[in-house]
Curated annotation (Swiss-Prot):
It comes from Rhodospirillum rubrum (strain ATCC 11170 / ATH 1.1.1 / DSM 467 / LMG 4362 / NCIMB 8255 / S1). The keyword Transferase applies. This is Bifunctional protein HldE. GO terms for cellular component: cytosol. In the N-terminal section; belongs to the carbohydrate kinase PfkB family. In the C-terminal section; belongs to the cytidylyltransferase family.
């Protein structure tokens, strides 16, 4: 069975994680109203304000997302001694799962981004802020706060919005601390010089940031991979996760690995803060022990949710769990194919060096004998294809009273099993045509057969494959189960 933890298990584990986040906090202010006329003073719309609200932005939005997922957070940032800074302090105070260590610089203007909306249409954004590195005293105080918390967390996030908190030696010192503690260090970068993040576990640039940092095009999959590899080689980071809007995400590792994840959003209303959601979900999942590729899948799902909402939204754990369940349903349904589609899928697997296994049957009423055979078959290969007799095929083999369940129901049940990677329905009496098309590396049947009597064994053996006769689980068969349901008795020798 696949040892990768289920996404649902990872989402459930997020309530037990604690993440340390350091970066540029800001106040995101949203002004909403209606546009009914154009100003007589200039060709601009007049917004009649209906609503105004403020929320944590920048690194603060990363914190909001970690908490929304159920996690806890230690948060280090710097604000000004002003009204916006006081608002940020109040908003952080409302987050009971956040331990805040916020420095105050009297001469600093807290970053405020004010967005004006008419309906769902953004009209204007106005920024009010100071962009300057921390003075040595504030930098040392911030690093001291990090030292006091870093042994109590499962991941470290650097959320760099280019406002100065992570300038100078601060970022390098933080990354060194994280790696000393064997923590995953996730950096949301800013600017053209990614060498400042040397030693990070994951960089998460968007497409534009990646292009600016490398001077390379980032329009296609191959171009993105090339740019990511340049960052890895030049900057000494372990991996780069490039976020690509409608084209999804691409994860590239220093080991040469590449993973493309398609975009999950059905409708996009607002991309504000989507990168923060990716970083937060990635960090929380890694803090919970998820493998990097799995954490990226979860982050991709979360991003698909958040861009469907207006404003810098956070994704609650319940919404992410619902998306996970929907993905599992879609993945299950995509496992059910015809012979031609099966060949395309198998060819793709082969190009990745995977060993293909094959077994077949009617699988009318699934029982422990079926499960045992499928488990043994999956253990002998990397991907298991199950050939499923169509309804017409079953009737010819078993009689007009069979199958009990139609082929759609039987295929759905099989596709729901973790040991089954693909279900291919065939209409012939035997799977010989399907076996000849797919040319599996391992052909599996029950031990009540001999190698010579297994349909397709000659094809597989001639092609360099092997035949596996799986141990049978005594006392289980579909035919005897049906007989008992009708008041009959179990018949010895009943088969699948």
């Amino acid at each position: 069975m696949d040892p990768t933890p289920a996404l649902a298990e990872i989402v459930a584990s997020l309530a037990r994680v604690r993440v340390l986040c350091v970066g540029d906090v800001m106040l995101d202010r949203f002004v909403r109203g209606d546009v009914e006329r154009i100003s007589p003073e200039a060709p601009i719309p007049i917004v009649r304000v209906r609503d105004e609200r403020a929320m944590l932005g920048g690194a603060g939005n990363v914190v909001r997302n970690i908490v929304a997922l159920g996690g806890r957070c230690a948060f280090m940032a710097v604000i000004g001694e002003d009204r916006a800074g006081a608002e940020i302090g109040g908003l952080l105070g409302d987050e009971h799962k956040v331990d805040s260590f916020i420095g105050i610089q009297p001469n600093r203007r807290t970053s405020v981004k004010t967005r004006f909306f008419a309906g769902s249409q953004q009209l204007l954004r106005a920024d009010d802020e100071t962009i300057a590195p921390l003075d040595p005293y504030d930098a040392d105080r911030l690093l001291g706060d990090v030292r006091s918390q870093i042994t109590t967390v499962g991941a470290l996030v650097l959320s760099d919005y280019g406002k100065g908190v992570l300038d100078g030696p601060v970022a390098a010192s933080l990354i060194a601390m994280g790696r000393t503690q064997n923590l995953p260090v996730i950096v949301d970068p800013k600017g053209r010089d990614f060498t400042r993040y040397r030693g990070a576990t994951v960089l998460t640039p968007n497409r534009k940031e990646l292009a600016e940092a490398t001077g390379l095009p980032t329009g296609t999959d191959d171009e993105v991979v090339t740019a990511c590899r340049q960052v890895i080689a030049r900057c000494g980071v372990d991996t780069v996760l490039a976020t690509r809007s409608q084209d999804g995400m691409t994860l590239v590792g220093a080991d040469g690995s590449v993973l493309h994840l398609p975009a999950e959003a059905r409708e996009v209303y607002d991309v504000s803060g989507a990168g923060d959601t990716v970083v937060a979900t990635l960090a929380a999942a890694l803090a919970g022990g998820a493998p990097l590729a799995v954490a990226c899948r979860l982050a991709n799902l979360a991003a698909g949710i958040v861009v469907g909402r207006v404003g810098t939204a956070a994704v609650p754990a319940a919404d992410l769990m619902a998306a996970v369940h929907q993905e599992e349903v879609s993945a299950r349904d995509s496992k059910i194919v015809g012979a031609e589609d099966a060949r395309e899928v198998v060819d793709k697997w082969r190009r990745h060096g995977l060993r293909i296994g094959f077994t077949n049957g009617c699988f009318d009423l699934l029982h422990p004998g079926h499960v045992s055979l499928l488990r043994q078959a999956r253990a002998a290969c990397d991907r298991l294809v199950v050939g499923l007799n169509s309804d017409a095929s079953v009737r010819r083999l078993k009689g007009d009273s069979r199958p009990v369940q139609d082929e759609t129901a039987r295929a759905i049940v099989l596709a729901s099993l973790a040991d089954v990677d693909l279900v291919a329905v065939f209409g012939e009496d035997t799977p010989l045509g399907l076996i000849t098309t797919l040319l599996p590396d391992v052909l599996v049947k029950g031990a009540d057969y001999t190698v010579d009597t297994v349909v397709g064994s000659d094809v597989v053996l001639t092609n360099g494959g092997r035949v596996l006769l799986a141990d049978l689980k005594a006392g289980f068969s579909t035919t005897s189960t049906i007989a008992r349901l009708h008041g009959g008795s179990r018949r010895s020798g009943d088969t699948l």
